[in-house]
Structure formats: structure tokens, C-alpha cells
Amino acid sequence: MAQIRIHEINTRIENEVEVSKFLQEEGVLYEKWNISKLPTHLKENYSLTDENKAEILAVFSKEIADVSARRGYKAHDVISLSNSTPNLDELLINFQKEHHHTDDEVRFIVSGHGIFAIEGKDGTFFDVELDPGDLISVPENARHYFTLQDDRQVVAIRIFVTTEGWVPIY
């Protein structure tokens, strides 16, 4: 279950109902998908083959189709980051640069953890700490950045409005 940390006042929101309400008020789509249907050999697997990635997409194909139909998404893929990822530290430095996109940035966490820091409507940033089963859509034009939690590993399905993917605007 996602948790929220508001930067300026270092306040945490951990209750599921309160997290959902907070994100809805900020215009952030949040859903919880059933992660238990992921096959055991794909859980906490950060060295994915193309076949593994295709299998992950197949497992969640109904959910992907549903959110895509509701929100106009056209493409998706699977990414994996861990300490075995070449140049992970350089990638994280790049990910942590505040930016926005002209379309939604959507991620579903399959394994591991991630954090989206998002600028709220009041101008203060808040973290959305994501766990397996969490789907988030950062709204278009919302300033944000992404990083990993202390375990430094994540497998995520990325869902895009266009087949070209997101273009960051710094």
C-alpha cells in the first residue's frame, strides 16, 4: 500500500483511505492491483528476460487494457532496475531531476519499491512511496521526479499515452 510523506512538514499519511483521498485531491490516479497473481518465478526477479517481461504484461493484461481504455493510453513496457543495472547511480541522478511531461506518467509496481516526489497543488512536494501492486498516474504538467527506496530495486510496468513514451521537460 502506498504511503505519503509531505516534505515541508515531514508528515506521513499511511492509512489506505486517507492516502487514496489525498492523491485524488491532488489529481493523482492511484489504484491497487492484485499482485498475488504474479507467478512465483517472477516475484522479486530483477534480471528479466524479454520472455519474463512479456509474461508480466500478460498476467496484468486485463488491468492494463482497463486503465488504457479509461484514460486513453496506447503503449506499455516493463522496466527493471537494481544494483545489477549498469550505471544505476547515473540513471538515478538523471531520474531525480525535477521535470514534467505533457502527458501522464503511469507506473505499476510489480516488485521492489519506488518513490515519486510530486509537486502538490499548493506548491509543496510530497513523496508517494510505492509497493508491489500500486499503480500511480502522475498528471500531465505536474512537476515531479522518481527515485528508488533503500532496497534500490524495482520492476514496473510503464504505461504511455503515445507509442513514443514520455519526454521530460526540465
Swiss-Prot record:
EC numbers, comma separated: 1.13.11.54, 1.13.11.53
Pfam family for this entry, one: ARD
UniProt-listed InterPro entries: ARD, ARD_bac, RmlC-like_jellyroll, RmlC_Cupin_sf
Marked site: May play a role in metal incorporation in vivo: 98
Catalytic activity, reaction form: 1,2-dihydroxy-5-(methylsulfanyl)pent-1-en-3-one + O2 = 3-(methylsulfanyl)propanoate + CO + formate + 2 H(+); 1,2-dihydroxy-5-(methylsulfanyl)pent-1-en-3-one + O2 = 4-methylsulfanyl-2-oxobutanoate + formate + 2 H(+)
Binding site for Ni(2+): 99, 101, 105, 144
Enzyme class: oxidoreductase
Feature type site, description Important to generate the dianion: 107
Keywords annotated in UniProt: Amino-acid biosynthesis, Dioxygenase, Iron, Metal-binding, Methionine biosynthesis, Nickel, Oxidoreductase
Site positions (May play a role in transmitting local conformational changes): 104
Binding positions (Fe(2+)): 99, 101, 105, 144
Cofactor binding notes: Binds 1 Fe(2+) cation per monomer.
GO molecular-function terms, A-Z: acireductone dioxygenase (Ni2+-requiring) activity; acireductone dioxygenase [iron(II)-requiring] activity; iron ion binding; nickel cation binding
Pathway(s): Amino-acid biosynthesis; L-methionine biosynthesis via salvage pathway; L-methionine from S-methyl-5-thio-alpha-D-ribose 1-phosphate: step 5/6
CDD domains, A to Z: cupin_ARD
Cofactor(s) needed for function: Fe(2+); Ni(2+)
GO BP annotations listed: L-methionine salvage from methylthioadenosine; L-methionine salvage from S-adenosylmethionine
PANTHER family for this protein: ACIREDUCTONE DIOXYGENASE (PTHR23418:SF0)
Function noted in UniProt: Catalyzes 2 different reactions between oxygen and the acireductone 1,2-dihydroxy-3-keto-5-methylthiopentene (DHK-MTPene) depending upon the metal bound in the active site. Fe-containing acireductone dioxygenase (Fe-ARD) produces formate and 2-keto-4-methylthiobutyrate (KMTB), the alpha-ketoacid precursor of methionine in the methionine recycle pathway. Ni-containing acireductone dioxygenase (Ni-ARD) produces methylthiopropionate, carbon monoxide and formate, and does not lie on the methionine recycle pathway.
HAMAP family: Salvage_MtnD
Quaternary state and interactors: Monomer.
Family note: Belongs to the acireductone dioxygenase (ARD) family.
Name recorded for this polypeptide: Acireductone dioxygenase
Organism: Bacillus thuringiensis subsp. konkukian (strain 97-27)
Gene behind this protein: mtnD
